């Protein structure tokens, strides 16, 4: 059977008080709308239409990589009106459509699959995703009879008996497409808000004798984010889910409460993550790594048996058995080889560092290609910027760079070379050479006495 999905993402989001469209606020590093789209896609639904309104162009721009179509809701006149704006998408389609809201980032793939399966197997005309809550105040109640769902009653319209019902409407549904399109044409805005409610379609189908079903899920999956407080609540719930998944997969989190792991991060088994770490984007961390406290790793590939201590790594690759930090800054487009050592207060930008190379402390390397088994003394600076352009430095294998050295780019240091401490290198150093580029030491005898400085 053909299955498709609509995602309502046109709302103003006034309570979140932001210039950014509400559905583009992030939860665990990913926009809420993308969370919803990705869960739908993982459930096997490829045909997805997003109803957009506020910030439409930005919403399109941020979701271009999700291969969805768009329908425009120029005026926000209710959920029924939003779905009606997707009539062109639904035109001539037969099968089942699920309707979601773009501000429910916690919905699970398995729940979506269950919703579709129940709808199809029970031969329902409409199926509502519901949840049981201790305090359903403000939510629409699900009224059931022996033959399924009888109606959805808004909180303000509930009788005393209906107020006791703790099964609430999540705002997520499945419909037979043709029946939905017909019901949408019969919905009116004859209510206190002057809006077209999608819930009225349920009542219309029920009045026609159609079968309405419901699938119950956990309340947290149905949470809609309408404020910064709810955004933080969703963040906490998803963070806990992610951390639990990694621990179940063989990763040790010393303190899950203070460990932030983005939803797309991958971590190998027997890796230990210490407190106060932030792992974001498409980061991949290998097996048997130690990520000590206060590190931030974004969109980077970390090999096996790597130690990272209190460092920032951005869009870079770190080879197996390498140590980084403490207090290292690995900037984008950097690749560090295996068995390397990047020490304290080292900054590396857009450079390649070979296997076994040691850059132990207080060094800047930018726009450089560094070979294997090199050693950088304390205070080395690759001078890559002339005030207008960046230039490249090449350093061969087995080179030794003495302390307090400046390498003025563009410059090439060949294999097996030594650079004397305190040198400023501005020209090529041939293989096997020692380069000394500093003023000759001169001692002035008796100078302290002559100046009257002796203590």
Curated annotation (Swiss-Prot):
The gene is glmU. Mg(2+) binds at residues 103, 226. UDP-N-acetyl-alpha-D-glucosamine binds at residues 8-11, 22, 73, 78-79, 140, 154, 169, 226, 331, 349, 364, 375. This is Bifunctional protein GlmU. Signal peptide: none annotated. PANTHER family: BIFUNCTIONAL PROTEIN GLMU (PTHR43584:SF3), NUCLEOTIDYL TRANSFERASE (PTHR43584). It is found in: Cytoplasm. It catalyses: alpha-D-glucosamine 1-phosphate + acetyl-CoA = N-acetyl-alpha-D-glucosamine 1-phosphate + CoA + H(+); N-acetyl-alpha-D-glucosamine 1-phosphate + UTP + H(+) = UDP-N-acetyl-alpha-D-glucosamine + diphosphate. It comes from Clostridium beijerinckii (strain ATCC 51743 / NCIMB 8052) (Clostridium acetobutylicum). Gene3D superfamilies: Hexapeptide repeat proteins, Spore Coat Polysaccharide Biosynthesis Protein SpsA, Chain A.
């Amino acid at each position: 059977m053909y299955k498709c999905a609509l995602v309502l993402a046109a709302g103003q989001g006034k309570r979140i008080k932001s210039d950014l469209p509400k559905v583009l606020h992030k939860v665990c590093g990913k926009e809420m709308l993308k969370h919803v789209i990705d869960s739908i896609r993982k459930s096997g639904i490829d045909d997805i239409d997003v109803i957009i309104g506020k910030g439409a162009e930005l919403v399109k721009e941020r979701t271009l990589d999700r291969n969805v179509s768009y329908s425009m809701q120029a005026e926000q006149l209710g959920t029924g009106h939003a779905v009606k704006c997707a009539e062109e998408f639904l035109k001539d389609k037969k099968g089942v459509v699920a309707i979601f809201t773009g501000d429910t980032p916690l919905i699970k793939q398995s729940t979506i699959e269950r919703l579709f399966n129940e709808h199809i197997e029970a031969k329902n005309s409409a199926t509502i995703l519901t949840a049981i809550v201790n305090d359903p105040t403000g939510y629409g109640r699900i009224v059931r009879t022996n033959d399924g769902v009888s109606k959805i009653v808004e909180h303000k319209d509930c009788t005393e008996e209906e107020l006791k019902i703790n099964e609430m409407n999540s705002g997520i549904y499945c419909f037979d497409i043709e029946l939905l399109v017909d019901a949408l044409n019969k919905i009116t805005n004859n209510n206190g808000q002057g809006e077209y409610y999608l819930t009225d379609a349920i009542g219309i189908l029920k009045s026609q004798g159609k079968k309405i079903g419901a699938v119950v899920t956990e309340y947290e999956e149905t949470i809609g984010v309408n404020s910064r407080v709810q955004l933080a609540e969703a963040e906490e719930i998803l963070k806990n889910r992610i951390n639990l998944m990694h621990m179940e997969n063989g990763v040790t989190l010393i303190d899950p409460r203070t460990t932030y792991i983005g939803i797309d991060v991958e971590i190998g088994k027997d890796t230990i993550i210490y407190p106060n770490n932030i792992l974001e984007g498409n980061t991949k961390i290998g097996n048997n790594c130690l990520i000590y406290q206060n590190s931030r790793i974004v969109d980077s590939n970390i090999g096996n048996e790597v130690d990272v201590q209190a460092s920032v790594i951005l869009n870079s690759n770190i080879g197996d058995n390498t140590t980084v930090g403490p207090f290292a800054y690995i900037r984008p487009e950097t690749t560090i080889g295996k068995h390397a050592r990047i020490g304290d207060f080292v900054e590396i930008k857009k450079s390649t560092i070979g296997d076994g190379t040691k850059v132990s402390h207080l060094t800047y390397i930018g726009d450089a290609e560094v070979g294997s088994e090199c050693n950088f003394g304390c205070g080395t600076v690759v001078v890559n910027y002339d005030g207008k352009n960046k230039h490249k430095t090449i350093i061969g294998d087995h080179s030794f760079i003495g302390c307090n050295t400046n390498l003025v780019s563009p410059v090439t240091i060949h294999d097996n070379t030594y650079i004397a401490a305190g040198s400023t290198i501005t020209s090529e150093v041939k293989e096997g050479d020692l380069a000394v580029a500093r003023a000759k030491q001169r001692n002035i005898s008796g100078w302290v006495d002559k100046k009257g400085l002796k203590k």
